Amino acid sequence: MYVVLKPDLDPEAQNRIIEELKNARLEVVALPGLDRRAFALVGSSQAAERFASHPYVEELIRDEAPYKRVARALHPHDSLVSIGPLTVGGDAFVVIGGPCAVETPEQMQTIASQIRAAGGHGLRGGAYKPRSSPYSFQGHGVKGLVMLSDAGSRYGLPVVSEIMDAQDLPHLAAHVQALQIGARNMQNFSLLKAVGSQNLPVILKRGLSATLEELLLAAEYIVDAGNDQVILCERGIRTFETATRNTLDLNAVAWLKNKTHLPVLVDPSHGTGLAELVPPLSKAALAVGADGLLIEVHPDPTQAWSDGRQSLTPESFSRLMHELRSLAEVIGRRMP
């Protein structure tokens, strides 16, 4: 439920109505950045309905969604999120590419140059790696962040990397332009609050078995903590199907674009687990309304330290970028 106050209210009158709402056992949630004086109300719908005819109230909007700050109900325009010089959202369609794991300085320099040459807009790479097996490569940590940052700086690409532990936040903040919260940490609420307390953009990936409402509530944690620079990412969910690594839920993109003002990316690499499926699913993501892609690219996928099977070669990535630009032009989207 939302309450919209009359525009001519003075601060004293506004404080008075807010106090009345609180006395009715309604939590009043501020919604900054709107053209109107609007607040989300959490609590009894019956109690909220009593304020529909209040002299200070212009409108009561009935919406029972549990997420408030990320909802589109009072925020009809798409939010724009800046990752360094790169703007995500609106009519632009962006592509962020890079290896699953940061391996060597030479690897990162090579792939950054190739992503730049193909027209990619950002560089991704994992310095801290959540792996299913404790014996798998776990990432280089701070050394990996330095390799990633150096490559991005040299080729003018803003960089994105995953955060797994709040104690690593100072290191990441010093080297990246955006944080990524992976599927396994989507409901790590202490981590969500930690990234919400700083001003770096956050790419929040959907959990393996998370509903879309749970994804939006996870985003709400970040925004409620003070950081409204949130980008959602559909990266596939776990189903009964075993032909692909996950099932890429493109329904989710259209649904999210209808329910939230936050930008939505798609990760077809994790969504399918198969490099040959990445190009068609990337084009489908563009067609269905996504704001961009996260794609794994490796100079030699057969030698990748992790997730080589789902990584594109630089040549495949370049072809895909050309195809995406052609499709974007047809459907009225813009690729920077």
Where on the chain are the PLM-derived regions?
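Alpha-helix-loop-beta-strand connector modules within alpha/beta enzyme cores
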Residues: 137-161, 195-201, 250-264, 310-333
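N-terminal small/glycine-rich loop or linker at the start of catalytic domains
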Residues: 81-100, 127-134, 257-266
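Active-site mouth loops of central-metabolism enzymes
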Residues: 93-110, 133-139, 158-162, 182-183, ...
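Catalytic beta/alpha-barrel core
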Residues: 6, 140, 156-165, 177-189, ...
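N-terminal amphipathic alpha-helix/helix-capping segment at the start of soluble metabolic enzymes
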Residues: 65-96, 322, 329-336
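Active-site-adjacent beta->alpha loops and helix N-cap segments on the catalytic face
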Residues: 72-77, 133-147, 166-168, 183-199, ...
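Catalytic alpha/beta core domains of metabolic enzymes, predominantly
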Residues: 83, 193, 198-297
